[in-house]
Regions:
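Positively charged n-region of N-terminal signal peptides that target proteins for export
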Residues: 1-6
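Bacterial N-terminal signal peptides
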Residues: 8-19
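Sec/Tat signal peptide C-region and signal peptidase I cleavage site
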Residues: 20-26
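N-terminal (or domain-start) structured segment
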Residues: 26-114, 152, 160, 164, ...
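An extracytoplasmic/periplasmic, membrane-proximal ligand-sensing/linker region
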Residues: 30-32, 173-177, 258-320
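Hinge/capping helix and adjacent helix->loop/strand transition within the periplasmic-binding protein
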Residues: 56, 80-90, 103-190, 242, ...
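Short secondary-structure boundary segments
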Residues: 95-96, 132, 206-208, 224-225, ...
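Short beta-strand->loop
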Residues: 111-121, 180-183, 201, 210, ...
Length: 320
């Protein structure tokens, strides 16, 4: 074989081999991308993702296909994300600290190392809410009643092993003499419906979910360091002398080992969306507290949660 012909054939072979072995090409995405939502339709995670989809469509031709996998405080959906195809055509929305709590409990089929982290998009403080017709006008009245009437009150939580559950555990640690029965729901839409229907007396939930029923709910306190811009007239728990700060963060991730080109594209596009002024305005209108974290900062935050939350779970006998 002549030298020129040999090297030409070799180059063609290498090019062909690369094309066959690479699952993602320059045209990614070439088809719709599946987005797994680990909670019920209509909940805060779904609402946020729908807003983000609008701006994904602004920058990307291929649309999202929403896949709902609710239940077990998000664990079912988080598992689906971890086990999804690594071709770049499936990623999902996840919640913190839910994912970390479930990992630490040793009941999950995933760990924090099961994912490629793409972005944090929301930091949503939690709050305490009752019906407007409730006898309780402030959190102290709830505490006093719970102390005198153990387990008579019911609190609705999304869970188990969710941010709502964590806030409940922190509450129990601060006030061991105040006994309140916990009731778990698959998602925030179910949780809100339970309070509206009288199944529970109060709920611990994130601001965005609760604000969607604000005409019928009374928000007693916010579990944040300072008053929230969406609820400027509602005092923090700290203002009431209760040292409890709790939030739920929404992030996006795909399975560990997903094609690097797809991961890069998703990270760049989500960051672009999160800095779009129109997106931020839509998030504000929807009561969604937007807060972007890049993948490295997000992973560092997750590692810090693993240390702090492990101790609380151990104290409650939820892990060894």
């Amino acid at each position: 074989m002549r030298p020129f012909k040999f090297f030409t054939s070799l180059a063609m072979a290498v090019t062909l081999a690369f094309a066959v072995s690479s699952p993602v090409r320059a045209a990614y995405p070439e088809k719709p991308v599946n987005l797994i939502i680990a909670f019920t339709a209509g909940g805060s995670s779904d609402v946020q993702a729908r807003i983000m989809q609008k701006y994904w469509n602004k920058y990307v031709k291929q649309r999202w296909v929403f896949v709902y996998k609710p239940g077990a405080g998000g664990m079912i959906g988080f598992t689906e994300i971890a086990k999804a195809s690594k071709d770049g055509y499936t990623f999902g929305g996840m919640n913190l600290p839910h994912m970390v709590l479930q990992e630490l409990s040793q009941k999950a089929a995933f760990t924090s190392d099961s994912y490629e982290y793409l972005a944090q998009v929301v930091n949503d403080p939690q709050c305490v809410a009752v019906l407007k017709t409730s006898r309780f006008k402030n959190f102290k009245e709830i505490l006093d009643f719970a102390k005198s009437n153990p387990n008579k009150l019911k609190v609705g939580l999304v869970g188990p092993l969710s941010g709502h559950h964590l806030m409940y555990l922190e509450f129990c640690k601060l006030f061991p003499e105040a006994k309140i029965t916990k009731v778990f729901y698959k998602g925030a839409a179910d949780q809100n419906a339970a309070l509206l229907g009288g199944e529970v007396d109060l709920i611990f939930g994130n601001i965005n979910d609760i604000m969607r029923s604000i005409s019928e709910f009374r928000i007693l306190n916010v579990a944040s360091e300072k008053r929230n811009a969406f609820l400027p007239d509602v005092p923090t728990l700290k203002e009431q002398g209760i040292n409890l700060v709790s939030d739920i963060r929404r992030i996006f991730a795909c399975p560990k080992g997903t094609d690097p080109e797809a991961v890069r594209f998703l990270r760049v596009t989500l960051k672009k969306i999160c800095s779009d002024p129109d997106y931020l305005e839509d998030m504000k209108k929807a009561g969604q507290p937007a807060e972007y974290l890049d993948p490295a900062s997000l992973e560092a935050y997750i590692r810090s949660l693993e240390v702090v939350d492990k101790k609380l779970l151990q104290e409650n006998g939820l892990i060894k």
